[in-house]
Amino acid sequence: MDSDTSPNPFASSPPSSPSPRPSLPPPVPRKPSSLVSAASGSPPPTHRASFPDPARHPKMGATVPGPKPKTGYCCSIDKDISAGEQVHIVDALKTTEGGTASYITYVIRLGTHTVRRRYSAFLSLHQSLTGLYPVLIIPPIPSKQSLTDYAVKGQSKAREDATIIARRKRLLEDFLQRLIRHPILGGEHVLHRFLEEDVSWSEVLHSPPISLLSKNPLHAPSHNPTFQPTTPTSPSEAPATTSYIAHHLLPTPSPSHPLRQPDQRFMDSEAFTEKFQSHFSGTMEKVNRRVTKRWGERAHDMSELGGIWNGFSLVEQGKLGDAIEKVGRAVDAEYLATAALLQSWEKTTTEPLHIYSQFATLIRARLSFRHQKHVQYELVQEALETQRDKLEILENAEREARRLEEALERGGSVLASPQLEPEAARDERERAQRRARASQGFGLLSAVKHSLSGMIDMDPEATRRANIAKTRDNISQLEDSYQAAAQDLKYASMTLQADLDRFQRQKVADLREMAINLSQVHRDWCKQNLEAWKAAQAAVREIDPHPNRPAQTQTQVQSQQSHAGPSTLHAQTEDDVSKLGVDAMKNEIERVEIEIADKPLPKPSLAETGGDGVVPSPQPRQENDTEEQEGHGPLGPL
């Protein structure tokens, strides 16, 4: 890995999060927790220590209380989940219950419980959990059908496509499995009711706690979004009502609003999530689609090639025809193995990559929500400082007016006001600068308003006192909102960081499993092809050898096979064929040389002997040869 790679901010846990634990043995039944979930009052699993406890009151001020503790399991579904039961979607059925149009329902099984839910119920469950837990990472669900599918296939065929239904079954099952394994979401009673048979999901959606959710999650407590005020019957219940009002008075900032003092830890998390999303969505998914497309094209070509070989086998007879048929079968087997590889590839690689691309989008939404909570805190803090400065100015003016009034009553002597001390003057300048920043863009309007109010006001003293009272009321409300925003920001930061730590450990385990599954898919593909081509090789060896090449003995073939390993068998076979051709050529040359050596040399003719039967000896070359003296060689002039 490159040295300039930024560190992973998800790996740094806050003090409330424990260090990653080693792999645990199979789940064992757990005892019910005395804590309850923040939304519906159902007990979460016991291993939720890394998350802040919403049942505890925060240290600063009296705010919205958390859920009340309870004992025991809330239902049989909760007990089965605690015992380690797994959830599965075992079937998808076409039905017309409750209407005239047909739709697909998915059969969910958890232990002995079986229930049928349609896709819209899964979608509403995801939306409900997102509202109940605005700072937790809710697992994604498969997206709806695209408009292109409806346009090409039609509405009914797109819904009933077997490939789409099978993919949805796997992705929806993954969604439910991630929910029940979550340390907080697994104890949510809304999820239990979704998995419980004979429960109308429509009634669940229109009953508490889902019906108590606020339309704007920024105006609700992060740790208890379903909190509703009641008429206080005792002084201890009054702060809860006050905090409820304070939450609804909080501003609604934009997600792009800048922060004056951002948290560096979450800035790193946002940058890491953006790179994580870009890497999965823009790089890995794109390359994965290209690779699977090429594998699919190769499978199509192998299908055509297998048909050609099988057709050719009908033309030939005997051992050659059998060998050609076996080669065609091997090609067909490779086509089938590639098709199986693509199916397994989609389950083990394509779908997990898409799930984590969706996870990146969901994490960015949770980080954006926490960012808005931080902006709320800073805006309320700034407004509170402005109102306090305004109150101080009004109170100073009131004291100055009273001092002048008392001086006039004592004798009309007007005392000069003492000069401000250097520190007081500096504080006054800072307050003036803050007021200028707060009223930036409204300077002319404020001046005109102040002038008009001065001309119209008939009793400035009463107006000033009314402004003081109104400012004090505003400060009181802002202090309540400031406490509520501070509590929300603290809980959102701690909970989101703890869930990011949990997600990081889960991501590492999932990517490891994905890599192992991908290697196993390729291994199985290679095994199937090897078996098919071994059968074809055995059939090819039964064909008679080439007439121009010496045939190998059975002993030579067996010795070569025994010394050759599986990985080098194919390469050695090609080398043997080439060596056989060279050896045959050498043998032919040696045979011709032997025949020539055994034949007697022919006798010289009369022309060569000069008529006397004696072959003349060659004349030696003269050193002073005329041609050489003239500069001529045997090939011409030099």
Swiss-Prot record:
Residues 1-14, 225-239, 552-562 have a biased composition (Low complexity). It comes from the Eukaryota. This is Sorting nexin-41. Belongs to the sorting nexin family. CDD domains: BAR_Atg20p, PX_SNX41_42. Residues 15-30 have a biased composition (Pro residues). It is a peripheral membrane protein. Keywords: Autophagy, Endosome, Lipid-binding, Membrane, Protein transport, Transport. It comes from Cryptococcus neoformans var. neoformans serotype D (strain JEC21 / ATCC MYA-565). May be required for cytoplasm to vacuole transport (Cvt) and pexophagy. Residues 84-201 form the PX domain. GO terms for molecular function: phosphatidylinositol-3-phosphate binding. The gene is SNX41. One of its GO terms (biological process) is autophagy of mitochondrion. The PX domain binds phosphatidylinositol 3-phosphate which is necessary for peripheral membrane localization to the perivacuolar punctate structures. A 1,2-diacyl-sn-glycero-3-phospho-(1D-myo-inositol-3-phosphate) binds at R118, S120, K144, R168. Residues 1-69, 215-239, 408-432, 545-638 are annotated as: Disordered. Residues 423-432, 585-601 have a biased composition (Basic and acidic residues). PROSITE patterns: PX (PS50195). InterPro entries: AH/BAR_dom_sf, PX_dom, PX_dom_sf, PX_Snx41/Atg20, Sorting_Nexin_Autophagy. It is found in: Endosome membrane; Endomembrane system.
